[in-house]
Amino acid sequence: FYQSVLGGNFESGFHYFEDIPGAQIPDEEKRRIMHVNLIFSPDQQIMGSDSMPSAGHQIHMGNNNHISLGVDSKQQGKEFFEKLSEGGEIESPYQKMFWNAYFASFKDKFGVSWMINYNLKENEE
């Protein structure tokens, strides 16, 4: 889903916990993602990993984190906001803010919290 919105490519594919040599991984966790890196512009990437309950990770969906995207243009921010927030919950719509930027915050349809920020350039509205 995220690649379809942001574009880009997965660097080196997906690495799974079952790929760790000699690791004792419970069967139900072997196909969880150990590392993935989505590069969607020369200066922007998102890296991710699944949680591992067997390692003591406790998942608390909701306000446990936000992914923040700094975007290249006002239009790119609007497009990312519209696509990522569809079916989710909008906290703050994509709009001009007092700190001279366009900003939005929301949860996507998977419950992941996002912030999108575009800093306006001089003489840009």
Regions picked out by a protein language model, each given a short descriptive name:
Residues 1-92, 105-125:
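Glyoxalase I/VOC metalloenzyme domain signal
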